């Protein structure tokens, strides 16, 4: 199993395995220090209905990212422009406070580069009475070894599967190995949680949701993702097909990322999805590409 002290001195937690000495102030691709850095902890109502429910998901947004996609919708925290360093004890207390606010679950957003610290915080919080499900909300670019360090602690994996087209993974996320890496990670997630389980109120208690944000001009890539996931896992996992891509200023000169996804592009993806026989899927309706989906990373709850 990965060791926190060793990994922080030569970080190999994520698939980039860049070897940064985070313990002594050096940072790698994710830009994260050794101390957990978070930008917001609050109830969040914009996840899938089975995650947010009516009382909200207790969401912790971590700063830094091992992908840092050029079109990132949360680029302020991905680039470490906001966030506060907190201790493992403080993080465990944040989990308990969110539970006290009647959160349906604890939702860890972009947690990959803090896996080992999060493991310690979860163990501590569970000793103090944390009982709600734990959601690991990630970009899909995960090390199997890091995921195994969380085995038994994570109830729900809410993972992106961004690319099956290698050229897009390289151009947009500088991760040419994304497709194969995401396949291995997803297999480990499904191994840990098994088939999705819901309670009487429709809230997910255990399982995997695979998200795909349809990018402009990338219907072929999206279809390939859906086909792979459904061919491999069938109804064991749920798909979440999103059309809310919002072109932000950093991509104003990058075509086709400088436009919204069209209604027709999304309809083509849905038609294909239904033609495969997919039934376990969350879809979006109406005009949803708005910056209102992007929360304020103002340090609330940290």
Predicted regions and their residues:
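Auxiliary Fe-S-binding modules of radical SAM enzymes
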Residues: 1-27, 194-302
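Conserved Radical SAM active-site core
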Residues: 30-156, 165-166
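Hydrophobic faces of well-ordered beta-strands that scaffold small-molecule active sites
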Residues: 58, 106, 134-136, 157-159, ...
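Conserved radical SAM core fold
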Residues: 78, 115, 140-143, 161-179, ...
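Alpha-helix N-cap and loop-to-helix initiation/capping positions
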Residues: 86, 113, 173-181, 217, ...
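Aromatic/hydrophobic pocket-lining residues that form the small-molecule binding cavity
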Residues: 91, 118, 182, 186, ...
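Alpha-helix-loop-beta-strand connector modules within alpha/beta enzyme cores
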Residues: 122-133, 184-189, 263-269
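Anionic-ligand binding region
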Residues: 170-201
């Amino acid at each position: 199993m990965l060791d926190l002290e060793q990994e922080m001195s030569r970080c190999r937690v994520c698939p980039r395995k860049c070897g940064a000495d985070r313990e002594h102030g050096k940072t790698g691709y994710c830009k994260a220090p050794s101390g957990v850095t978070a930008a917001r902890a609050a109830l969040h109502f914009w996840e899938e209905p089975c995650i947010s429910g009516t009382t909200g998901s207790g969401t912790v947004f971590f700063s830094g990212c091992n992908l840092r996609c050029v079109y990132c919708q949360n680029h302020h925290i991905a680039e470490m422009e906001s966030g506060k360093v907190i201790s493992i004890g403080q993080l465990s207390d944040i989990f308990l406070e969110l539970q006290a606010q009647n959160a349906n679950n604890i939702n860890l957003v972009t947690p990959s580069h803090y896996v080992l610290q999060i493991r310690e915080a979860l163990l501590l919080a569970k000793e103090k009475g944390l009982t709600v499900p734990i959601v690991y909300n990630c970009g899909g670019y995960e090390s199997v070894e890091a995921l195994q360090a969380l085995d038994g602690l994570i109830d729900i994996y809410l993972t992106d599967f961004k690319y099956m087209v290698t050229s897009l993974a390289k151009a947009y996320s500088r991760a040419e190995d994304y497709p194969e890496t995401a396949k291995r990670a997803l297999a480990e997630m499904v191994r840990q949680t098994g088939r999705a389980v819901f309670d009487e109120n429709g809230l997910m208690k255990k399982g995997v949701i695979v998200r795909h944000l349809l990018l402009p001009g990338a219907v072929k890539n999206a279809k390939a993702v859906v086909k792979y996931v459904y061919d491999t896992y069938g109804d064991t996992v749920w798909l979440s097909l999103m059309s809310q891509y919002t072109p932000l200023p950093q991509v104003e000169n990058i075509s086709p990322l400088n436009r919204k996804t069209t209604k027709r592009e999304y309809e083509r993806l849905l038609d294909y999805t239904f033609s495969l026989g997919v039934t376990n899927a969350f879809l979006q309706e109406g005009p949803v590409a708005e910056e209102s989906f992007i929360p304020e990373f103002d340090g609330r709850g940290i």
